[in-house]
Amino acid sequence: MPPHKAESELTVSTPTRRVQAIVGLRLLEMLRDQDLPGEILEAEDPTQTMPRRLGLSDVVDRQIRTYQRDVKKGVRLADAEVLDLFRLIIRRPDGEEVFYGAGRLLASMERPSRWTRVVPQRVQYAVARGRVKRRLKRLFGRRVGGFGRGPFSVEGRALVFIESDPGGEACHFLSGFCQEILEQTGGGVVQVKHTLCQARGDDQCRWEGMFIDEPAEDIQSEADSSERVEAGER
């Protein structure tokens, strides 16, 4: 067999490993943490709680330990392995919560810079867009989606983490991811809406986020300043 042919077959048969292992780790940790071992068995609905109890299995615990080692070694995962994890979560009645929580955890890996909380909102939106773009690319090893019109509008078609989910539950992953990034950036109350979804028949998925309140610390600071002014006037 010619060398170039052997090399070609090896390339085809070996899946590309692009996804950081921490993606798998956070998904399984959220799955495990959602389980409630203290549920009252007599009152439970087995069709609802049994799939959740599966998250406490030895198989999941062993895989969590494997991913913990992979994270330390910088090992990356193949898309097929990540999609299998998403399919596992989709079968659970609390899948949306697991995806949302994992998205938030993966977005909060870095310590937020507080300077972004005192700049104009247009700057905050620009910073948030940059953080979403960079962190998703770092996690999945490629560009994930893009940005549409508006201050914060994430868009994409056939995104890597949604390919395994025709029902749209996995979309909550990016909802949680964007929510965390915006909260870190602005420090106040944030609203993220999944306004378009391919699972609902739209031609693409879209997430729109906005700041709807000031950071609590800034509000308290203003209140303290007002009290000092009033005290001085008296």
Protein language model regions, located:
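Alpha-helix boundary/interfacial micro-motifs
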Residues: L174, V192-K193, Q220
